[in-house]
């Protein structure tokens, strides 16, 4: 049985659902039991068996109330047009801990670039936490599907299938032969890598800036079309605002997070000074309508907090405090530093911790 449960499942918050996802090495059928109801990895009524990562979507309310779920795997002997041969179902039950109402602890990992042990150590330095934020470039590129396993290994080691995670795509994730299938290997909402989510009294929105240079940059070799992708997100953001009573103004929301791998309030030098009009519109809509408490970013490989009155930083415009919380070193010994968050009424505390067991800096924003 252990070969089928090599990794604990990852439980990702997407919209008003949890996507329970788990990598597998052999063909099998995958379903999850929550309470007395089964949820299946199926496509239009057909159980999937050939995918490398299974996905089952469960309503948040159901799993939060049940506080446990059972992963069910039925190994395939031979899948045939008639009388498919299978083995008996293997089951493993996991406890599940919904995000609490107060003193909510989260840890942010970005730009790990294929490191696993080091970001895990940095997170463990912060201590126990209630949910994990994976904010882009967890892998170094999407040229090899085996790299996606690193995402699930980090979730497995830190969350153990018992607590939720939030996932955002980074610019390096757009590179390589399997980048076009990235959403098949990671959480998404209707195929999109941008969406809102809810965890307890926390509401959040993920925006995906795509690549960090113009679409026609030679590095991409005509393989990206991020401008139209960003235009779609402008319309998505407007729809979120139109539906605000079911989104960031819904009953019970106390904290509003903006998560994006790229720091789009800060204009970098050419060729990284892209999409100034689109980003200006995002900033205006977010600042005037959504009003998030904090913008959680990576990309720059640094550990910093920038406030709205910092005109040097907010060259595209300001929304709220920006926390950049991911630093990595892969030469002369692997090293990683990330960022812990503690959310309380009227206060957010950030703690930068590293893989050497050090707390580098703490700050209340």
Predicted segments with their positions:
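Active-site neighborhood of phospho(di)ester-bond hydrolases with catalytic His/Asp-centered motifs
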Residues: 107-111, 131-137, 163-171, 257-261, ...
């Amino acid at each position: 049985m252990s070969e089928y449960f090599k990794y604990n499942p990852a439980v990702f918050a997407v919209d008003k659902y949890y996507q329970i996802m788990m990598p597998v090495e052999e063909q099998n059928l995958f379903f999850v039991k929550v309470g007395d109801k089964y949820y299946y990895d199926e496509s239009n009524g057909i159980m999937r068996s050939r995918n490398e990562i299974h996905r089952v979507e469960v309503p948040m309310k159901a799993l939060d109330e049940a506080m446990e779920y059972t992963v069910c795997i039925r190994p395939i002997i031979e899948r045939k047009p008639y009388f498919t041969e299978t083995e008996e179902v293997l089951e493993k039950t996991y406890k599940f801990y919904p995000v609490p109402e107060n003193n909510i602890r989260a840890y942010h990992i970005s730009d790990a670039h294929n490191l696993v042990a080091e970001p895990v150590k940095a997170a463990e330095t912060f201590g126990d936490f209630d949910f994990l934020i994976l904010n882009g470039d967890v892998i170094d590129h999407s040229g090899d599907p085996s790299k996606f396993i690193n995402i699930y290994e980090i979730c497995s080691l830190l969350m153990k299938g018992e607590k939720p995670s939030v996932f955002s795509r980074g610019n390096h994730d757009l590179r390589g032969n399997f980048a076009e299938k990235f959403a098949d290997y990671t959480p998404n909402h209707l195929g999109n890598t941008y969406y809102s989510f809810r965890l307890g009294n926390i509401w959040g929105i993920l925006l995906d800036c795509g690549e960090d240079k113009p679409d026609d940059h030679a590095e991409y070799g005509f393989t990206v079309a991020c401008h139209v992708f960003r235009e779609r997100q402008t319309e998505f953001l407007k729809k979120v605002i139109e539906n605000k009573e079911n989104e960031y103004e819904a009953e019970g929301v106390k904290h509003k997070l903006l998560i994006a791998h790229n720091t789009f309030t800060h204009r970098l030098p050419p060729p990284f000074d892209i999409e100034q009009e689109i980003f200006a519109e995002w900033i205006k809509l977010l600042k005037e309508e959504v009003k998030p408490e904090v913008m959680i970013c990576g990309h720059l490989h640094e550990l910093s907090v920038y406030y709205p009155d910092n005109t040097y930083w907010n060259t595209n415009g300001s929304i709220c405090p920006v926390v950049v919380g991911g630093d990595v070193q892969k030469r002369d010994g692997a090293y990683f530093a990330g960022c812990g968050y503690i959310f309380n009424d009227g206060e957010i505390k950030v703690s930068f911790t590293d893989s050497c067991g050090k707390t580098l800096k703490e700050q209340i924003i």
